[in-house]
């Protein structure tokens, strides 16, 4: 068994996997990696099953010390990672020698990085997943939903010898301001015509009041003209519009039901891009039909089949 000791951490550093499924009828949310694409690539670099537990590091402030020689993988944001002061770029596997320190300093490009280990980090499964949901006290190293803390030990049982990189063609360019695809929802026709124009033709700024439950988009207030709604199930990526007219994108740790009208839901690929945006960043929304969104999603999944 190989071990890493956490030397520094923040409440935003969490153990995550693909999340919990089949439990929303119990009032339990999904959880899981906010940028599932990057987590999958981190696992792919080590030949892991793509949904194995990895460390989600948001905005930096995380450091580990290797207790034995090991080979790990890093994908996602550039958070100024360093090995004993030497810069380490993401989208590759790398060797960390016994006693060496891997440290994440600050965001240089993107918001979330994913650190994976051969065979995945050891953690108990709660309702079929190790994903950490702090609000629900589920998942994580102890199964109680706690963030990673200084002094804790990360262990794993696998071993990999080959160092490799994610092909350049498959790495997302986090500098691009790609529109976020939105599958239209049932209440879309109950917003004013001007609001529908503004939704897709105006920029939206990410509010600093953001967490793993949701991100508020700041811009022109939208006007809902329909009747009050009865609460209903909320899918991942749902874009709700509360009475103040400022949309909220609901993320992995969202509540399971809600009663605000919805514009629709962002696609999984759009959510992965949104997860890498810092507060204050501007985004645009683009309407897409479900068939197109599904086809693009399936095509993206084919990328992980490369050897």
Spans of model-derived segments:
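Conserved "landmark" site that anchors the functional core of diverse proteins
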Residues: 1-307
């Amino acid at each position: 068994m190989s071990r890493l000791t956490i030397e520094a951490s923040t409440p935003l550093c969490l153990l995550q996997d693909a999340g919990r499924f089949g439990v929303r009828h119990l009032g339990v949310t999904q959880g899981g990696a906010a940028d599932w694409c990057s987590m999958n690539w981190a696992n792919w670099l080590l030949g892991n099953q793509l949904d194995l537990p990895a460390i989600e590091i948001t905005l930096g402030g995380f450091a580990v010390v290797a207790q034995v020689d090991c080979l790990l993988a890093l994908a996602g944001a550039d958070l100024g990672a360093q090995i004993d002061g030497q810069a380490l770029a993401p989208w590759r596997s790398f060797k960390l020698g016994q006693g060496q320190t891997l440290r994440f300093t600050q965001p240089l490009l993107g918001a979330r990085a994913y650190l994976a280990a051969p065979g995945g980090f050891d953690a108990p499964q709660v309702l079929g997943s190790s994903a950490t949901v702090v609000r629900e006290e589920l998942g994580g190293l102890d199964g109680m939903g706690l963030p990673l803390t200084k002094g804790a030990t990360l262990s794993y049982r696998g071993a990999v010898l080959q160092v490799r990189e994610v092909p350049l063609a498959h790495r997302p360019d986090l500098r691009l301001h790609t529109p976020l695809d939105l599958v239209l929802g049932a209440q879309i026709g109950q917003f004013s015509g001007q609001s529908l124009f503004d939704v897709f033709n105006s920029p939206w700024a990410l509010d600093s009041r953001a967490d793993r439950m949701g991100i508020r988009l700041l811009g022109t207030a939208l006007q809902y003209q329909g009747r009050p709604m009865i609460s209903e199930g909320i899918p991942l990526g749902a874009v709700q519009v509360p009475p103040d007219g400022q949309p909220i994108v609901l993320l992995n740790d969202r509540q399971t039901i809600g009663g605000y009208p919805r514009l629709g839901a962002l696609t999984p690929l759009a959510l992965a891009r949104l997860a890498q945006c810092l507060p204050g960043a501007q985004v645009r929304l683009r309407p897409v039909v479900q068939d197109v969104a599904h086809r693009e999603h399936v095509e993206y999944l084919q990328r992980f089949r490369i050897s």
